[in-house]
Amino acid sequence: MLRPSGAAGVGFIAALFAFLVTPGPQAAGVLAPEPIIAGVRLFYGPGDGFGAIDERLIAGARRHIDLAGFVLTDHGVIDALSRAAARGVVVRVYLDSEENDRSARAIATLANAPKVEVRRKAPSRDLMHLKSYQIDERLLRTGSANFSFSAGSYQDNDLIVLESPQAAARFLDTFERLWARPDNQRIGVR
């Protein structure tokens, strides 16, 4: 092993110490929060298997799923959420007020299942345009793809999966703020 000695050794140790204790450049403005360290997976659709990614991710949930969706019409995703709840996973779904009636019956059935709560944003001119969910405070799914059959089958979309407790926590903070709006409408019996 190479061991610096004498003046060179002192200089090396001083430089190493300075490197270790000197803070890196500080981000300012919108980049002020610390960067999130994450395992990142990017998917682009339409393509083979793109529409089934959400179902596979939801199938891996063990404790919690918090989903904020502008659109939730994909019966595969709705069924995956129902199966997760049947396994004991607590499921919360937050939808935009513009959500159409194409899946109203399926969403009502989901909302009445044990371990599931569904809320809809009160009507306003502002959209809740998220297409994201967190699973077990460890994984965040986000991107341009709505939770719809067409998003996975026909539309050009991206889907980003971050395996990061920090990313999931940042989303969960936003989700809790949206979920707590006093004028939200509850769907189902809860």
Regions found by a protein language model. Name each.
Residues 68-72:
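N-terminal carbohydrate-binding/catalytic regions of secreted carbohydrate-active enzymes
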Residues 11-20:
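Bacterial N-terminal signal peptides
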Residues 1, 20-22, 30:
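Compositionally biased, intrinsically disordered/low-complexity regions enriched for serine, proline
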Residues 1-12:
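Bacterial N-terminal signal peptides that target proteins for export
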Residues 7, 21-25:
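Intrinsic disorder/low-complexity segments in short proteins, especially the signal peptide
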Residues 24-60, 73-79, 83-190:
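HKD-type phospholipase D/PLD-like phosphodiesterase module
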